[in-house]
Amino acid sequence: CPFGSECLSEAAREQARNADLVVTNHAMLAIDALNGGRVLPEHDTVIIDEAHELVNRFTRAASKDLSPAIVTTTAKRAMTWLDDDVGADLLNQADSMDHALEATVPGRVTTPDAQVIQTCAVLRDLARVAVSQLGRNDEDSREPVDAERVQAQAAMREVFETAERMVRLAAADVVWVSESEKGYRSIHVAPLSVGGLLRENVFAQSTTILTSATLCIGGNFLAIARDVGLSPLEQIEGDAPEILETQMGWRGVDVGSPFDYSKQGILYVGRSLPRPGRDGIAPEVLDDLAELVWAAGGRTLGLFSSQRNAIAAAEHMRSAMPDIPVLCQGEGHLADLTRRFAADPRTCLFGTVSLWQGVDIPGDTCRLVVIDRIPFPRPDDPLMAARSKAVEDAGGNGFMTVSAGHAALLLAQGAGRLIRRADDRGVVAVLDPRLVTARYGNFLRASMPPFWTTTDREMAVGALRRLGE
């Protein structure tokens, strides 16, 4: 780093190099892997907690975005050191990208002649020139390094590399256009798989231990192993056999749970309820929800597949049971809503994906966890759809591998919100009949904690009422 001892990043690296144990996060581990191991100090062993999130975190770290706002901000930041025509051309190209994105239907982009890809190609060429101009005369200059110029060049290089990657449309990447809730569009690129990156730049470099309460999907470790780049044929069972140099042996060990799930919790599945559709949450589901919440006396964490469903459920509950406070994600800071939920046992908290993981509310505050539907990925999710197609093209079952695997992991995480300590009791209610009627139901249930299971609503209601006595 040109700033030497004044650089906080360099100081942190030096401190890490002298440590016996370094605690970091998934994002930093991913950045280290993407940069060939040049970020973290040399190490013999890596222990990765919450490893069920590893693929998503590595995917996020390896993904890039471009938008008119990003291009405009980067161009203005660099304007002082650019020739006037280059700076003006970059700003004009931001406008061109805006028009190209507006003309593109949100979704995956696969053809090089697509207008938005052609726009990225022009942007790439302009950014390449800008990077060169931002770095010229550095070698001969006796002036102190200009920090702002260095940062502007780094930002412009990021735009160049991202545009270049998008234009390339490599088979290993997925490129797509998205639209935000406010109507702003942007273009994204993400790896089709991060298995190779993990295998070569993490597992091959040091002994690695992955830990999580939800690595066992469908009753075994094969799904997570495949996602992180390990082959089922490399699994070691029993006494360790000889491993070929080309193989990377791995073991899956289920160490059990301190909880007696079959005695502490009930899984209720609404078998008689209508299958979820596109028209929002059904009246029958809302009626089931209300009866369960009434029996629990509030004390409910509601995990919904969409913000629309969460809001509809909250409005229904407030109308049907005005004496029970209902908090809904989006009505305040999530941390504040969670604190209020934990402080008042009669309160309900409804929300979406942010609540499925990491919420830890032990005790009587949470006796009922409601899941409105099986959390399959959206069918129009470009990255998930591309991964599913890749599995199909390789002769596998794309739905079970990608969509059902995604749902199984979220169900395991969501259901895990109920039992947080040895004296917790309660009910997980899945208001989607497919969990017991569809062919993939067994796979999904095998991924969840082994609660005692029923499809009898009155039995679940009775259990909740007895807990309140």
At which residue positions do the language-model features occur?
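ASCE RecA-like P-loop NTPase motor cores
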Residues: 1-469
